[in-house]
Amino acid sequence: MKAAVCREFGKPLVIEEVTLADAGPGEVKVKLSAVAICHSDISYADGAWGGTLPAVYGHECAGVVETVGSGVTTVKVGDHVVVTLIRSCGHCHGCSMGNPVTCSTQFPLDAASPIKDKDGKSVVQSMRTGGFAEKVLVHESQCVTVPKNIKMASASLLACGVITGFGAVTNTAKVPAGSHVVVIGTGGVGLNSIQGAHVSGARTVIAIDVVDSKIEAAKSFGATHGINSKTEDVAARVLEITGG
């Protein structure tokens, strides 16, 4: 298969022929239809976050299940899925406490990358996904089925930006209905934090940014008010909007 491989930080990714291992026990091979670009991928490729090379970045993926390994029960061949970077066993302390991101289980895919270059040398599967490729091999816990009528390009966004912003409000902050919520920055994560606050029943959702068009866009995600921090006194406006 083809993959976009980072051979040198700060340089263009190189399209190469690579091989992907077969699905082992509990693993799923997904033929990708769409991969979003997260700023984390850019930071890695630029070398800002370091890391080992060569590597295949990309971790916001959506596609169709091509093959499954033994013991896989949550997805089947032909399913449309979103692929996330979180692997979890579902049984350790972290998982049992409802925090799969802290899963302590070591998976075979953590020990050895399933990606090899044309010379048979290992290529890092970045962020447990390696999504800038035609296919990925992941643990079944990383796959979430979605309806087949959802566009894959839209579904891929669910894999990181949406769950990061939405989950920060609903799972971490646990914002109760009737709250006042302020979200600083209306990028991908910020917009989904706004959406999470709206769905949670927040009475006031204030979007703060320096670009008026982004503030207006935030209102379509549930923001009730917008503040441009370049032209307005943020603290004073928040106090005014919320009644102190």
Map each language-model feature to its residues.
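Adenosine-nucleotide cofactor-binding segment
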Residues: 183-186, 196-244
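Short beta->alpha connector loops at strand-helix junctions that form conserved
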Residues: 21, 85, 105-106, 147, ...
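N-terminal Rossmann-fold NAD(P) dinucleotide-binding loop
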Residues: 190-191
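Structural signature of beta-strand start/N-cap positions in the alpha/beta core
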Residues: 71-74, 180, 203-204
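Well-ordered beta-strand positions
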Residues: 80, 134-135, 204, 225
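NAD(P)H dinucleotide-binding glycine-rich loop of Rossmann-like/cofactor-binding domains
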Residues: 91-184
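Glycine-rich beta-strand-centered segment in the early N-terminal region that forms part
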Residues: 21-35, 46-96, 101, 145-149
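Nucleotide donor/acceptor-binding cores
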Residues: 1, 79, 178-179, 203
